[in-house]
């Protein structure tokens, strides 16, 4: 992957105060990779700037406050995340990764944003670098921060990314049970894979789908009243866990 070429952005990283940096980067479409950009809602609303960077796909990480500005022209994935330490982002990692990879299979370019391009959206970009290039959190974070100097996931997001890295690189020593379910009421279209502590038959709900992961096997359980979409997404998540 190419290193960021935005010399002005990199210079801003070194000399500006926090407030001045926020103001500067608010209008910057920060290049992370040739086909991956990171920025704010200001950039997300600038059709000409998105066109200049050949953006075809938009990952909106702040649907609670940022609309889909060009839904008839660009392909959107919208997440209704709040920038709070207790917000669970780990359960949607694989759906986010699928969005990235679907766009790249069609030779697309992805723009990722939240309100300011600081915490929510940068966390998703860091996740992608960790996954795609097999990086630890700190290395991926520094890569993104070199391109966008205001990059700063909140401590909750940071810890979840570190924990995910540990989970996918260390051997499975005990059974993990994941529930496949809508992420949240405001965002029923986003299907999440949430770790549950109820490992065993007593923890299974007939309205849901569950994936059990052992040291060497994956099992899919579909409840009698589970929606087809949950079952389909469960199979997608199993494919991810097998990689």
Regions found by a protein language model. Give the residues of each.
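Cysteine-based protein phosphatase catalytic domain of the PTP/DSP
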Residues: 14-112, 116, 131-160, 168-170, ...
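Intrinsically disordered, low-complexity linker and terminal regions at domain boundaries
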Residues: 241-243
